[in-house]
Amino acid sequence: MLLRGKTAVISGGAGRRGIGFATARLFVEHGARVAILDIDSKAVREAAAELGAGHVGIACDVSDAGACRAAADEVISAFGHVDILLNNAG
């Protein structure tokens, strides 16, 4: 995969048995930087920590436009840009 150096944002990615987290792990294995968004603040921090250094977990309710804007600002602050968006929440 051509993911080295790419930045991916994955919503609904904190569930360790779900498609979002599995995709996040695959992206990391192929060199991407990943930001996981999830409504569960504790789970999203733990999921990002499991991915390793250089990845972030952001608590975000994707049904709240303001929360999405704040999450986008946090991702841009951390990585500078976004290459891939996987809307997996819900």
Label each residue range with its predicted role.
Residues 2-35:
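Canonical Rossmann dinucleotide-binding motif of NAD(H)/NADP(H)-dependent dehydrogenases/reductases
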Residues 9, 35, 56-58, 85:
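Conserved Rossmann-like nucleotide-binding pocket used by diverse enzymes
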Residues 47-53:
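Short, conserved SAM-binding/catalytic segment
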Residues 39-45, 59-73:
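The beta1-alpha1 cofactor-binding region of Rossmann-like NAD(H)/NADP(H)-dependent oxidoreductases
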Residues 3-4, 53-55, 74-87:
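A glycine-rich helix->loop->beta "capping" turn
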Residues 8, 20, 63, 72, ...:
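Ligand-binding pocket scaffold of soluble enzyme catalytic domains
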Residues 21, 25, 29, 45, ...:
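Amphipathic, non-transmembrane alpha-helical secondary structure
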Residues 38, 61, 83, 87-88:
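Acidic active-site catalytic centers that drive phospho-/nucleotidyl reactions
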